[in-house]
Amino acid sequence: MLGIWTLLPLVLTYVVRLLSKCVNAQVTDISSKGFELRKIVTTIETQNLEGLHHEGQFCRNPCPPGERKARDCTVNEDEPDCVPCQEGKEYTDKGHFSSKCRRCRLCDEGHGLEVEINCTRTQNTKCRCKPNFFCNSAVCEHCDPCTKCKHGIIEECTLTSNTKCKEEDSRSDLPWLCLLLLLIPPIVYVVIKKACRKHRKENQGPHESTTLNPETAINLSDVDLSKYITTIAGAMTLSQVKDFVRKNGVSEAKIDEIKNDNVQDTAEQKVQLLRNWYQLHGKKDACDTLIKGLKTADLCTLAEKIHAVILKDITSDTENSNFGNEVQNLV
């Protein structure tokens, strides 16, 4: 009895090992069958393009190019019922089992494309670049505009390559550059000559630039400016008057004094400043000093204006004097 109880664990261990081997064998067999099933399905999927397609039932052959399947096969290895694709809008270019045709490609003009070959039931639309556009990629989804050359063309633009342009050649500008260098010296000479002539004309004395009789020319340098001070002051700005008198002997202290005495009246400041200068300078050559001083300060227009006023007045006085003398001679 004791021996039986001793052998029982050994028997149970053997049974467990035997059952384990059986289970492993079954699992291995199931895995092997699963692999074989996947292999069969893969083979069937591959054969879809070769003549068999499983969709409900197996169809023996695909629909030819330009057609699509109208309905599923009802019997294994039956012939499919195929109908044509819509001409000009759809196509299929190889045998297939699909119930749909492919949509024809559109050639987008906005991307530089145009139709080369129209779409048929068995062939998709073929696009190409429009004139003056190119595409250098294998599949053209868009075309780029050809480059426009400024300095000449090496190679014209084609459907597959851009224009090759000549680079700007500095030597082409050489003749123009030489011509410009030849023209510069005479142009500079003419400009300088005119500037010198203008400068000489501006620096001429009042009696040199205007044709006067000898008597008027002599008296112009000694003309009494006191009666013209107000007119001259009215033609000048305060800063111009200050600048002139400062350069011609009037001290800063005197300028400040006149300013403080006439703080609210700039017109009176100008008159008093010019009177003070005239008193310091004296009558002799005062007119010439005033005219030349204004021209030196680049106030030629103002100098000519003042000179014209004085000259007109002197000429009028001279004519009146001559008229009086003629009357006396007649008497």
Curated annotation (Swiss-Prot):
Species this protein is from: Macaca nemestrina (Pig-tailed macaque)
Cytoplasmic topology ranges: 193-331
Residues that bear Phosphothreonine: 211, 318
Localization (cell): Cell membrane; Membrane raft
Record's comment describing the protein's domains: Contains a death domain involved in the binding of FADD, and maybe to other cytosolic adapter proteins.
Coiled-coil regions listed: none
KW Magnesium (keyword) present: no
Limits of the Death domain: 226-310
Residue span of region Interaction with HIPK3: 209-313
Region (Interaction with CALM): 226-250
InterPro entries: DEATH-like_dom_sf, Death_dom, Fas_rcpt, TNFR/NGFR_Cys_rich_reg, TNFRSF6_death, TNFRSF6_N
Name of encoding gene: FAS
Modified residues (Phosphoserine): 221
Annotated membrane topology: Single-pass type I membrane protein
UniProt main location, coarse: membrane
Protein name: Tumor necrosis factor receptor superfamily member 6
SUPFAM superfamilies, sorted: DEATH domain, TNF receptor-like
Entry's transmembrane regions: 172-192
